[in-house]
Amino acid sequence: DTPSATYKKELLFKLMQAFADKNADYFVADPEVVEKALAEAPTDLDHYTPESLVAFTAAKKALEGVGAETTRAEAKELISSLKAAQEALVYTESYAKEVAEKEAAEKLAKSKVISIDAGRKYFSLDQLKRIVDKASELGYSDLHLLVGNDGMRFVLDDMTLEANGKTYASDDVKAALLEGTKAYYDDPNGQALTQAEMDELIAYATSKGIGLIPAVNSPGHMDAILVAMQKLGIEHPQATFDTVSKTTMDLTNEEAVNFTKALIGKYMDYFKGKSKIFNYGTDEYANDATNAQGWYYLKWYELYGKFADYANSLAAMAREKGLQPMAFNDGIYYNGDTSYGTFDKDIIVSYWTGGWNGYDVASSKLLSELGHQILNTNDAWYYVLGRD
């Protein structure tokens, strides 16, 4: 009732639009709205299954038929039908795999990971929770937790293992692993996390938006497991070169290899469905028995191919259990040489070292060109080994 007020067409048009929308049964469909809905529909339909395209094609055709006699209400219903059919589209199996791999690669590329070596040194559940708290606060994405690295500091409720045509009783395996861990380092703060504690840690990390990447290292960094195998009756599981290794398994000892695969498989079974990635190590082969020349020794003795087969078998095992396989970089195409063996391209390479004097590793560029995803964990920048 104020004729002196300034006329604003935007306000009038908005009111006209609202009235038309409110009385959609009496107004003709808005062609711009229809065109927008059609433009948002996918056009490359080769990625979808024929079955799921039936409803989508019919809904799109119906919307394309909107004309001067179609009301807004009818058009709105047709648009809703098209959107529902679009949401119900199903990728073909091959394209779904391609999308999943792309998403996993993007997630890995954006990962911000804190790595805790809870194999060498015991970390309590409370300590690990506090680390998770800080990781969440700072915006980290994952906790990489080495539970088997020199020591073995995570024990499942049931450690029964089937290998070498025999059954290794749960209590015997637990006792042997505990003895091996104490032989490596008898930590006064504790020895190993229980399954209940790991369950709680994973649930807690999930609640804080932190994923968990478990690691059980082999065939190197196996000090505790090597002692355990001997206690369980497996003779001479250690690799022997200049001296007998305290850390590394002999890849020609089938009894030791079978036991180790059964043990790692046990942990993979536990972590499947709880973690996306499983790191099985494979770094620093027999460095203590070769003056850090273990990879050269494997090549000299024509055993490098056996190492590649071992690494690939663990990758296949992880994949079968729904886990992405991860391994450290130094043993993979050592010295950039691809002539001694081929590694599974599904192995995510945790690139922890660029090498040192006489320890010559493949470049990250080569590994990427050979099809591997790379997680940058360069120890020269990030690695701190606590001495106390």
Give names to the regions the model predicted.
Residues 1-102:
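Beta-rich interaction/scaffold domains
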Residues 101-119:
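N-terminal small/glycine-rich loop or linker at the start of catalytic domains
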Residues 106-110, 150-207, 222-258, 286-302:
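Aromatic- and acidic-residue-enriched carbohydrate-binding clefts of CAZyme catalytic domains
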Residues 112-116, 143-145, 212-216, 278-280, ...:
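Hydrophobic faces of well-ordered beta-strands that scaffold small-molecule active sites
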Residues 121-135, 360-363:
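Short, acidic/polar
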Residues 127-151, 271:
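Catalytic domains of carbohydrate-active enzymes, especially glycoside hydrolases
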Residues 138-140, 197-219, 245-279:
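An active-site-proximal structural segment forming one wall of the substrate-binding cleft
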Residues 250-348, 352-372:
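Active-site neighborhood of glycoside hydrolase catalytic domains
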